[in-house]
């Protein structure tokens, strides 16, 4: 546990000492602020549903930037060998990088909570969909970071890692549109692999155990494969 905490502090320092983290936060809040203002004062929308779907898309684009360097950079600089020859094992390394990345994303979501406060000031929002929407975003982010870690563990090139994860995210985003064209039972199998299909219930105030299980399973499988890839290479 102590070794994990040491690794976590190291990852947090590396992440938040980089200007990339603050640029991502600034761009994220700028886009969300603009969209929220339009929805509130022009469309008079008193929900965050539209905002949740925009955050969904932004995560598809920003998580590859966050995760691309996690292991790929360690391989390029050959510092991964130093970590592996220390008392830290592959599982501790992967989970430290995962938690550090999630801390940045959770911080972004906490800051976006200001929009919910504004809704409460100007009206009487339904808090159920707001809480379920944020829960869905956390679960989505965990799955995306897991996949991003996996792609980063497969290469020493950050750009390749980012492109691999971005391609995977975009495929899992639109796969349901093509799944409906397949014959039974392949159609339901492919559709159920879609990130958006499992996110929509959260954004609209519904919570199903199957959707929670999907994101948790995707996260744990990605982390497991990341550990194995790190051990194998």
Language model regions located:
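Aromatic- and glycine-rich beta-strand/loop motifs that create alpha-glucan
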Residues: 1-21
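Hydrophobic alpha-helical transmembrane segments of multi-pass membrane transport/permease proteins
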Residues: 19-38, 54-63, 167-171
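Transmembrane helix boundary and interhelical loop/hinge segments in multi-pass membrane proteins
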Residues: 47-48, 66-84, 98
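Long, hydrophobic alpha-helical segments
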Residues: 53-73, 108
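Hydrophobic/aromatic residues in alpha-helical transmembrane segments
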Residues: 63-67, 115, 146-147, 225-226
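Terminal transmembrane helical anchor/hairpin motif
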Residues: 164, 168-229
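Secretory targeting signals
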Residues: 35-37, 48, 58, 100-159, ...
């Amino acid at each position: 546990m102590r070794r994990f905490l040491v690794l976590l502090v190291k990852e947090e320092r590396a992440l938040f000492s980089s200007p990339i983290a603050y640029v991502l936060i600034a761009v994220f809040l700028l886009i969300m602020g603009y969209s929220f203002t339009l929805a509130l004062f022009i469309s008079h929308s008193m929900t965050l549903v539209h905002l949740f779907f925009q955050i969904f898309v932004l995560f598809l684009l920003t998580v590859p930037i966050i995760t691309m360097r996690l292991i790929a950079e360690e391989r390029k600089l050959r510092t991964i060998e130093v970590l592996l020859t220390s008392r830290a094992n592959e599982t501790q390394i992967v989970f430290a990088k995962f938690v550090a990345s999630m801390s940045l994303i959770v911080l972004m979501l906490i800051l976006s909570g200001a929009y919910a406060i504004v809704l409460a000031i100007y009206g009487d929002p339904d808090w159920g969909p707001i809480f379920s929407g944020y829960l869905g975003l956390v679960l989505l982010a965990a799955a995306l970071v897991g996949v991003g870690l996996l792609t980063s563990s497969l290469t020493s090139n950050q750009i390749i890692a980012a492109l691999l994860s971005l391609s995977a995210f975009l495929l899992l985003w639109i796969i349901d549109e093509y799944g409906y064209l397949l014959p039974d039972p392949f159609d339901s199998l492919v559709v159920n692999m879609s990130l958006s299909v499992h996110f929509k219930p959260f954004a609209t105030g519904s919570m199903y155990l199957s959707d929670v299980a999907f994101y948790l399973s995707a996260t744990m499988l990605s982390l497991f494969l990341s550990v194995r890839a790190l051990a194998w290479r």
